[in-house]
């Protein structure tokens, strides 16, 4: 919906729309509206999504990018998505945006700006995925703590930063899984995400939604990895305490 077209977007749309950017956009808008109605019929309360970004190519601010250009990008997202949000409101369904590179909200401050642009409309919340924050240098559980009231869904996904003096954070146009990269996604528990701190923040907030395993470790067998990841989530997902440790000696 919100992206500027390039040939890769043809892969998401019907074949007959290939190379027709505005027709693809309109198809995507109607698809998202239909998804809201389908979710309502199925009793689904949250749909995860991407919004896209018309300004992702400006993330580096060179060639020179003006504040007005960036603001226009955020306003374009508001313009394109408001009619979609209206349908979700009518259906009693909420959207959860995965904060993710290439999206209008990809880190802490861009997420804050998006929510402000949308006047903190409750229709749109966050699909929290720590793996995309870790390699950017954002501490996942602190992001979670600050945006916890907007977290509607949680991805359990790990990543490892392996900078070695030659590699960088931008991927080097090298495929995921290649050991020359400066970071890669890892099976749960094999990366740098502190999931215990994440669970503690979720428990403190009373989050009772899904912990959805997203598994993308190119260096591990999928069946072994998925089995191990499921066990990892069960282990780390401890229940919150129902009392304080010193309640027995309170003055009440």
Please give the residue ranges for each predicted region:
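C-terminal helical cap(s) of enzyme catalytic domains, especially alpha/beta-barrels
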Residues: 222-243
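Short, solvent-exposed beta-strand-terminating loops
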Residues: 1-6, 47-55, 156-170
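Short, acidic/polar
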Residues: 27-37, 136-144, 195-198
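A structural motif
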Residues: 39, 44, 151, 207-208
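Hydrophobic residues within beta-strands of alpha/beta enzymes
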Residues: 47, 95, 154, 210-211
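Acidic/histidine-rich catalytic cores of soluble enzymes
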Residues: 71-192, 241-245
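A short, acidic, flexible beta-alpha connecting loop/helix-capping segment that sits on the rim
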Residues: 212-222
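Active-site acidic/histidine proton-transfer and metal-coordination neighborhood
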Residues: 5-125, 247
């Amino acid at each position: 919906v919100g992206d500027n077209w390039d040939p890769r977007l043809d892969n998401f749309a019907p074949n007959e729309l290939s190379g027709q950017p505005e027709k693809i956009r309109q198809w995507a808008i109607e698809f998202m509206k239909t998804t809201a109605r389908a979710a309502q019929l199925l009793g689904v309360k949250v749909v995860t999504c991407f919004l896209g970004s018309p300004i992702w190519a400006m993330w580096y601010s060179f060639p020179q990018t003006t504040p007005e250009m960036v603001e226009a990008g955020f306003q374009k997202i508001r313009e394109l998505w408001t009619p979609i949000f209206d349908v979700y409101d009518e259906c009693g369904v909420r959207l959860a945006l995965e904060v993710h590179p290439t999206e209008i909200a990809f880190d802490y401050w861009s997420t804050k700006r998006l929510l402000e642009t949308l006047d903190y409309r409750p229709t749109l919340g966050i699909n929290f995925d720590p793996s995309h924050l870790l390699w950017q240098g954002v501490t996942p559980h602190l992001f979670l703590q600050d945006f916890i009231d907007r977290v509607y869904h949680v991805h359990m996904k790990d990543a490892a930063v392996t900078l070695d003096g030659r590699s960088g954070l931008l991927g080097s146009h090298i495929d995921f899984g290649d050991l020359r990269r400066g970071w890669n996604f890892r099976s749960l528990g094999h990366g740098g995400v502190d999931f215990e701190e994440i669970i503690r923040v979720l428990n403190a907030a009373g989050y009772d939604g899904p912990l959805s395993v997203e598994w993308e470790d190119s260096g591990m067998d999928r069946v072994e990895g998925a089995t191990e990841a499921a066990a990892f989530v069960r282990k780390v997902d401890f229940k919150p305490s129902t009392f304080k440790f010193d309640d027995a000696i309170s003055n009440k």
